[in-house]
Amino acid sequence: MAVKLHSTSGGAGPDLVLLHGLFGMGNNLGGVARALQSHYRVHSVDLPNHGRSGWMDGADLPTMGDCVRLWMDHHGLASAHFLGHSLGGKVAMQLALSHPARLEALVVADIAPVAYPSSHDAIFTALDAVAAAHCGSREEASQLMAGHIAEEGVIQFLLMGLQRGADGSYAWRFNLEGIRRDYAALRAAPAGSAGSAPYQGPTLFIRGGESDYIGEEHR
């Protein structure tokens, strides 16, 4: 099953697809998109269960990759350059393994093609606290999350996922329960299918200087 993906596009040139990270949305990479629009036709895509895209159950890496492939079909993109951050990097790698001809080149930011241990318990607790409180302001949500998350930058990132409802209270734009159910599958390593052709296109991995998501053991 696939869902409709929301996207925005701008610029001119070869097609470049940007895929965001867990709990994010396409406009998280807005600065990157604007910087590259003078050289590329940049498409910022919301992954399933994120942003303004549709919600679904069973959104593992192969399913997310297939949703992106179908989005490409809908927009007439036979192939494109890809830049994926975190979860978006995993989805891009999965697409490269499943449908290598659809990628002209691949840039993966701050994630490796491996399975990761669970590391978001505090974040899920903070998100649950905000969801249960029906906060009337972003400041209230920020204060609630600060009781569980020490990093202010993480709190500010998550606040971007809030949307105000008709009753004035804030709720998460992303599918919190769906992401929770699929969390183990999203932590898995991208994997190709038996007999599938390997992806042999240009690939660049970018490691954050203070991040531990790409370690020396992944080099």
What is each PLM-predicted segment?
Residues 63-80:
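Conserved acidic catalytic loop of the alpha/beta-hydrolase fold
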